[in-house]
């Protein structure tokens, strides 16, 4: 299953889907992914908005790998976002 998320970094606002595969009987939660030993999180079907650009250009990407150290805020996206 996947969860739609909003991610804020110093330079970008990212909206996309984090896929959380089942491991055994327990479904992985977003916090499990963020606290794992992996240093990157995969985000699919995402839109990146440049936060510091005057015209706030938005880019669409099928897939990005985001370094966890660059995340300022991450949360499930709201329906209206």
Spell out what each predicted region is.
Residues 1-81:
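Conserved RNA-binding domains used in RNP assembly and mRNA/RNA metabolism
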């Amino acid at each position: 299953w996947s969860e739609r998320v909003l991610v804020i970094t110093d330079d970008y606002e990212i909206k996309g889907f984090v896929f959380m595969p089942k491991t055994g009987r327990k479904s992985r939660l977003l916090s499990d992914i963020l606290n794992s030993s992996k240093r990157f999180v995969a985000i699919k079907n995402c839109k990146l908005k440049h936060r510091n650009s005057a015209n706030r250009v938005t880019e669409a990407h099928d897939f990005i790998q985001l370094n966890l150290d660059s995340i300022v805020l991450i949360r499930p996206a709201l329906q209206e976002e």
